[in-house]
């Protein structure tokens, strides 16, 4: 029996609260069960030096965890003087995922920074960050259109992510912390709304997994992501 009695293919309750803060062009509080992440999208005119004069935009991301988002306090990375490898890996993943959602040529020479701050962690913080940041990004892009900075919205479609894994020999979707810490296999999957794969991060933490198990996990992820995308679209429609 999974925590909260979920079936193996069931994601946790997903909530997306838009316009959560007042200053950012897009802001979303995303909740996957007890995992809560604040995602903001900030627009700047201009692009990094390596893109200057090419007529296209850029999307980047930063990720961080509040000191007491976890069971025991973790010192802020700013206090340590440097970002950890996990943080850098996750923020690059978020940026890659969200660039797949946008026509960067149509964006023009704007940079959008997605800041994902974990308020409470109970597994799946990177997948929640991608899911919430995509909605914040959609709001920010719509503001560029409404303000006359862009003629058409460069958003190609929604992007969402979910964790899948093998726990006690069973393939399950959207792992919370107690499952994640005991998983034999742990995988994060990012997809477009039509089911195309952007990224797969998978590791056999305990027992190696088979090709058949990989296909099972990807199918589980696709079903979970379809449900999450429906929640994203419902949030944007309100």
Curated annotation (Swiss-Prot):
Keywords, sorted A to Z: Nucleotidyltransferase, RNA-binding, rRNA processing, Transferase, tRNA processing, tRNA-binding
GO biological process: rRNA catabolic process; rRNA processing; tRNA processing
Residues noted as binding phosphate in the record, renumbered to the chain: 86, 124-126
Enzyme Commission (EC) number: 2.7.7.56
Coiled-coil residue windows: none
GO function terms (MF aspect): 3'-5'-RNA exonuclease activity; tRNA binding; tRNA nucleotidyltransferase activity
UniProt xrefs under Gene3D superfamilies: GHMP Kinase, N-terminal domain
Pfam family, one: RNase_PH
InterPro entries registered for this protein in UniProt: ExoRNase_PH_dom1 (IPR001247), ExoRNase_PH_dom2 (IPR015847), ExoRNase_PH_dom2_sf (IPR036345), PNPase/RNase_PH_dom_sf (IPR027408), Ribosomal_Su5_D2-typ_SF (IPR020568), RNase_PH (IPR050080), RNase_PH_bac-type (IPR002381), RNase_PH_CS (IPR018336)
Enzymatic reactions: tRNA(n+1) + phosphate = tRNA(n) + a ribonucleoside 5'-diphosphate
Subunit structure: Homohexameric ring arranged as a trimer of dimers.
Function: Phosphorolytic 3'-5' exoribonuclease that plays an important role in tRNA 3'-end maturation. Removes nucleotide residues following the 3'-CCA terminus of tRNAs; can also add nucleotides to the ends of RNA molecules by using nucleoside diphosphates as substrates, but this may not be physiologically important. Probably plays a role in initiation of 16S rRNA degradation (leading to ribosome degradation) during starvation.
Family: Belongs to the RNase PH family.
PANTHER family cross-referenced by the UniProt entry: EXOSOME COMPLEX COMPONENT, EXOSOME COMPLEX COMPONENT RRP41
The protein's name in its UniProt record: Ribonuclease PH
């Amino acid at each position: 029996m999974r925590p909260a009695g979920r079936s193996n293919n069931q994601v946790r309750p997903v909530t997306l609260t838009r316009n959560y803060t007042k200053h950012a062009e897009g802001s979303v509080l995303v909740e996957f069960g007890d995992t809560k992440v604040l995602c903001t999208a900030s627009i700047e005119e201009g692009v990094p030096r390596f893109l200057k004069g090419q007529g296209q935009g850029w999307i980047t991301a930063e990720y961080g965890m509040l000191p007491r988002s976890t069971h025991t306090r973790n010192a802020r990375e700013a206090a340590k003087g440097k970002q950890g490898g996990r943080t850098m890996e996750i923020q690059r993943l978020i940026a890659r995922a969200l660039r797949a959602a946008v026509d960067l040529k149509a964006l023009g020479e704007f940079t959008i920074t997605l800041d994902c701050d974990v308020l409470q962690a109970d597994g799946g913080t990177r997948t929640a960050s991608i899911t919430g940041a995509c909605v914040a990004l959609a709001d920010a892009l719509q503001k560029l259109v409404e303000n006359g900075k862009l003629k058409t919205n460069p958003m190609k479609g929604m992007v969402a992510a979910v964790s899948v894994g093998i726990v006690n020999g069973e393939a399950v979707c959207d792992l919370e912390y107690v499952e994640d810490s005991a998983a034999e296999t742990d995988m994060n999957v990012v997809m477009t709304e039509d089911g195309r794969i952007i990224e797969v991060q998978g590791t056999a933490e305990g027992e190696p997994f088979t090709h058949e198990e990989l296909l099972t996990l990807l199918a589980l992820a696709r079903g979970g992501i379809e449900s999450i995308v429906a929640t994203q679209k419902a949030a944007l429609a309100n």
